[in-house]
Amino acid sequence: MAKKITAYIKLQVKAAQANPSPPVGPALGQHGVNIMEFCKAFNARTQGLEPGLPTPVIITVYSDRSFTFETKSTPASVLLKKAAGLTSGSARPNTVKVGTVTRAQLEEIAKTKNADLTAADMDAAVRTIAGSARSMGLNVEGV
């Protein structure tokens, strides 16, 4: 018989840097999950990623307090800020442009995000990422 699911927890945790402090500890603790077990498993799974990049994770908690988790790719906004060398996007994206990204950079980000995007092909994925860049106040070259 399948285990009964009691909760889904969505968090963004820095890759290879999960620890029991907030936000991880309180979110898992209120559902009775072994926090250190999650931290060790998450850090092991994200070892290949660049340390410190925010990584979305969806944790499924079962009635016996066991859990499974699925990691997603880093948010496009974080990758775009990194590609453009920025710390934040524009406060007024339609009027104030804060940086520029090229098609090559967009293709690299689209390859990273491809598993999480619903785009039919790579060109559609690049256009999706380009739309995110424009909404952050970045100029897009070559698209």
From Swiss-Prot:
One of its GO terms (molecular function) is structural constituent of ribosome. Gene3D superfamilies: Ribosomal protein L11, C-terminal domain, Ribosomal protein L11/L12, N-terminal domain. Pfam families: Ribosomal_L11, Ribosomal_L11_N. One or more lysine residues are methylated. InterPro entries: Ribosomal_uL11 (IPR000911), Ribosomal_uL11_bac-typ (IPR006519), Ribosomal_uL11_C (IPR020783), Ribosomal_uL11_C_sf (IPR036769), Ribosomal_uL11_CS (IPR020785), Ribosomal_uL11_N (IPR020784), Ribosomal_uL11_N_sf (IPR036796). Keywords: Methylation, Ribonucleoprotein, Ribosomal protein, RNA-binding, rRNA-binding. One of its GO terms (biological process) is translation. PROSITE patterns: RIBOSOMAL_L11. It comes from the Bacteria. One of its GO terms (cellular component) is cytosolic large ribosomal subunit. Coiled coil: none annotated. Belongs to the universal ribosomal protein uL11 family. Forms part of the ribosomal stalk which helps the ribosome interact with GTP-bound translation factors. Part of the ribosomal stalk of the 50S ribosomal subunit. Interacts with L10 and the large rRNA to form the base of the stalk. L10 forms an elongated spine to which L12 dimers bind in a sequential fashion forming a multimeric L10(L12)X complex. This is Large ribosomal subunit protein uL11.
